[in-house]
């Protein structure tokens, strides 16, 4: 199985970039993982929220390949404890998911078409995080899940 984190816009904070690099390398010991970046829209400030969501949505939809299992990282999604997320990831591996595609939307969320395309929605917290920070938090949780699956000493209950 391959896991991809699809994000809108590049990561700009150097501390977050360093954390993403660190956890991406760690996750790479367990699964083929990458982060794909959809470029930010040009002149986005001139667009309404609805226009921005629609235009970003079209770019997101183009990045989805046939056979992808699409999971939106969305505040309205299902919440897991870390051990539950690990079991969920392990189940996806066991059913031979080709590519598990997690998507972080732009600042205003997802278009309706993206919601309709998604198979599942997952929430990392009821709290709101920046779209920059959520990238690092997700990759850390993915690493944590694989250490749980492989019985490695990282996660503590």
Regions inferred by a protein language model and the residue ranges of each:
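Conserved strand-to-helix beginnings and helix N-cap segments that scaffold or border functional pockets
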Residues: 17-20, 82-86, 115, 135
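N-terminal beta1-alpha1 ligand-phosphate binding loop
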Residues: 1-27
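Loop/turn-to-beta-strand initiation segments
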Residues: 2, 98-102
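Structured adenosyl-cofactor binding patch, chiefly the S-adenosyl-L-methionine
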Residues: 112-156
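Short glycine-rich anion-binding loops that position phosphate/pyrophosphate groups of nucleotides
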Residues: 11, 75-78, 106-109
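Proline/glycine-rich low-complexity loops and linkers
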Residues: 105-106, 117
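S-adenosyl-L-methionine/SAH cofactor-binding core of RNA-modifying enzymes
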Residues: 32-33, 39-98
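Short hydrophobic segments within beta-strands
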Residues: 6-8, 36-38, 73, 103
